[in-house]
UniProtKB/Swiss-Prot annotation:
<keyword id="KW-0067">ATP-binding</keyword>
<dbReference type="InterPro" id="IPR050062">
    <property type="entry name" value="Pro-tRNA_synthetase"/>
</dbReference>
<dbReference type="InterPro" id="IPR006195">
    <property type="entry name" value="aa-tRNA-synth_II"/>
</dbReference>
<comment type="subunit">
    <text>Homodimer.</text>
</comment>
<dbReference type="InterPro" id="IPR004154">
    <property type="entry name" value="Anticodon-bd"/>
</dbReference>
<dbReference type="GO" id="GO:0002161">
    <property type="term" value="F:aminoacyl-tRNA deacylase activity"/>
</dbReference>
<keyword id="KW-0030">Aminoacyl-tRNA synthetase</keyword>
<keyword id="KW-0547">Nucleotide-binding</keyword>
<dbReference type="Pfam" id="PF03129">
    <property type="entry name" value="HGTP_anticodon"/>
</dbReference>
<keyword id="KW-0648">Protein biosynthesis</keyword>
<keyword id="KW-0436">Ligase</keyword>
<dbReference type="InterPro" id="IPR044140">
    <property type="entry name" value="ProRS_anticodon_short"/>
</dbReference>
<dbReference type="GO" id="GO:0005829">
    <property type="term" value="C:cytosol"/>
</dbReference>
<dbReference type="InterPro" id="IPR045864">
    <property type="entry name" value="aa-tRNA-synth_II/BPL/LPL"/>
</dbReference>
<dbReference type="InterPro" id="IPR007214">
    <property type="entry name" value="YbaK/aa-tRNA-synth-assoc-dom"/>
</dbReference>
<dbReference type="Pfam" id="PF00587">
    <property type="entry name" value="tRNA-synt_2b"/>
</dbReference>
<dbReference type="InterPro" id="IPR023717">
    <property type="entry name" value="Pro-tRNA-Synthase_IIa_type1"/>
</dbReference>
Length: 602
């Protein structure tokens, strides 16, 4: 392609809307343009990148035995109501674009396709002889993000590969799950990305187990915790660990002390000259279940630890049937302002104990009249600890679990693991932290959707049983931007060869020089004939502008038909390293063919 014939516009200044390097560079280099918040046009260079990523994904999915199809973007609400996710996606999380057609039927623009594919399986799969089967698609998805940001990382419209497998049993599911784990690893390796597969929370998708594939980058939204021995890695939402041992207190008896202005752990530690591991802090939440009932949650956790909201959400979801509900719609931290909605008397925030009375909860038919009390495992073994006295400006010391302060009946891991914690599999190993961008997510769904939607098959014994499912997603557009986030420098993008829009760019410093132009044109035609993807910068621009643009757009190999042409040579610059050399014109094609073949070899 000749750059003079391409719609190619670069920006010298960083766009004000962009926050992270990859977003800035994709805008500056003319790869994408913003149409509205979270909505982007993919310009010709970007479309070539996306096609290359899609091709790698498609090759590896086909290699795994999966079958490509295309599912509708517009989905009827009935399917989502059947699975029980309509309210979750349109009200609780609110991420689905929904609409009503002229016949007053509710529809949604698909953020994911579990319901559609399960309905298809229900209609098409009858016997165990048809199993296992794995279908996938590559298409545009939609999410009504509250705050779209970071360009293609968190947009309202994006390209994704999603696949769904159906099985006769869990053993078969696990086989395909491992195949997909290996497939995703190969995809990211072929795309030239450094990544880590980590244990993850299944979120609204559900299921018994899942892994995320994280591309490591400083600007990643997710925190990954891992051990140096390579035996453990997890998203911080899912991670488990052993916290530091608690320091014993010196208190012998229970006493109530005045602790003015000690509503925070730091202030209390300073005032009592104690250690945060000796404190039981108590955190309040307001939970809303899908039947409209409101639960007030009191979490007791060690003073040096933080509550993991995802783990707490999952714990409360498992408790939902106790309150006539099936799921949790909303969970928010309570404070003095929001407490006015449900508190019968003022709540002494900062001085709350695990035994705060139920009587402080306002009488209301929609509000559960008792605290949902949850103790994190870090507090269970504490003795003679410090905690709130349930009175403003006062704390109790020397407290033990028992009659005076009952241990909550619900004990769960709701703490946030952190770097420095000991690993569960080997306490001599300590967790380390890294930032990551979630590119892929694979799930063992089990029978969650098939049971809800009555998608069954007849097994070998002639029994009608639910299909066992797995699902597997990888973000195509997100992967492309993540590659830029991981591969860039001060001059611009440094594309991995496998997904670069072009493999070679030829720069003509002076198009008025007939010898330079003729050499460039000859090379251009020879490289094209050899099957090498080449871009010819034949614009009427200054040489400095062309060199800066070549660095900015990140093409892996640059050929310059400058002064060396007089000696029958061309300058070669490798974008990733900046290494420069000269090659005889007669050797250029052969050299690049060999280099590119070696880099793209499996």
């Amino acid at each position: 392609m000749r750059l003079s014939q391409m719609l190619f516009v670069t920006l010298r200044d960083e766009p004000a809307e962009a926050e992270i390097p990859s977003h800035k560079l994709l805008l500056r280099a003319g790869y994408i343009r913003r149409i509205a918040s979270g909505i982007y046009s993919y310009l010709p260079l970007m479309w070539r990148v996306l096609q290359k990523v899609s091709a790698i994904v498609r090759e590896e999915m086909n290699r795994s035995g999966a079958l490509e199809c295309l599912l509708p973007q517009l989905q009827p609400a009935e399917l989502w109501q059947e699975s029980g996710r309509w309210d979750t996606y349109t009200k609780a999380e609110g991420i689905m674009f929904s609409l009503t057609d002229r016949a007053q039927r509710q529809l949604g623009l698909g953020p994911t396709h579990e319901e559609v594919i399960t309905a298809l399986a229900k209609d098409l799969i009858r016997s165990y002889r048809q199993l296992p089967v794995h279908l996938y698609q590559i298409q545009t998805k939609f999410r009504d993000e509250i705050r779209p940001r970071f360009g293609l990382m968190r947009g309202r419209e994006f390209i994704m590969k999603d696949g769904y497998s159906f099985h006769a049993d869990v053993a078969s599911l696990k086989e395909t799950y491992q195949v997909m784990y290996d497939t995703y690893s190969r995809i990211l390796q072929r795309c030239g990305l450094t990544f880590r597969a980590v244990e993850a929370d299944s979120g609204a998708i559900g299921g018994s187990g899942s892994h995320e594939f994280m591309v490591l980058a400083a600007a990643g939204e997710d925190e990954v915790l891992y051990t140096a021995d390579g035996q453990y890695a997890a998203n911080v939402e899912k991670a488990v660990s052993l916290p530091p041992d608690a320091v014993p207190t010196t208190y012998k008896t229970v006493a109530t002390l005045d602790t003015p202005n000690a509503a925070t752990i730091d202030a209390l530690v300073e005032q009592l000259q104690c250690h945060p591991t000796q404190i039981v802090k108590n955190v309040l939440y307001r939970a809303v279940f899908d039947n409209g009932r409101v639960g007030l949650v009191l979490v007791s956790i060690r003073g040096d630890q933080e509550v993991n909201s995802v783990k707490l959400h999952n714990t409360l979801t498992s408790l939902a049937p106790n309150y006539g509900a099936t799921k949790l719609l909303d969970l928010r931290l309570a404070d003095a302002h929001t407490a006015q909605e449900w508190a019968a008397t003022p709540i002494p925030f900062g001085y709350i104990g695990p035994d705060l009375e139920d009587a402080v909860i306002k009488a209301d038919s929609q509000i559960i009249p008792q605290w949902i009390r949850i103790a994190d495992r870090t507090v269970v073994e504490l003795k003679r600890f410090i905690t709130g006295a349930n009175r403003d400006q006062q704390h109790r010391v020397g407290v033990n679990w028992g009659k005076s302060c009952p241990l909550p009946a619900i004990i769960a891991d709701v703490r946030k693991a952190q770097a420095g914690d000991r690993a569960c599999h080997d306490p001599t190993q300590h967790l380390e932290a890294a930032r990551g961008i979630e590119i892929g997510h694979i799930f063992q769904l089990g029978t969650k959707y098939s049971e809800a939607m009555k998608a069954t098959y007849t097994n070998e014994q002639g029994e009608e049983v639910p299909l066992v499912m797995g699902c597997y997603g990888i973000g195509i557009s997100r992967l492309a931007q993540a590659a830029v986030e991981q591969h860039h420098d001060a001059q611009g993008i440094v594309w991995p060869l496998a997904i670069a829009p072009y493999q070679v760019i030829i720069v003509v410093p002076n198009i008025g020089d007939a010898q330079q132009m003729q050499a460039a044109t000859d090379l251009y035609e020879q490289l094209q004939a050899a099957g090498i993807e080449v871009l010819l910068d034949d614009r009427d621009e200054r040489a400095g502008v062309k060199f800066k643009d070549a660095d900015l757009i990140g093409i892996p190999y640059r050929l310059v038909t400058g002064r060396a042409i007089a000696n029958g040579e061309v300058e070669l610059i490798i974008r990733a390293t900046g290494a420069k050399s000269t090659l005889p014109l007669t050797e250029v094609v052969r050299y690049l063919q060999k280099e590119i073949a070696q880099q793209l070899a499996p």
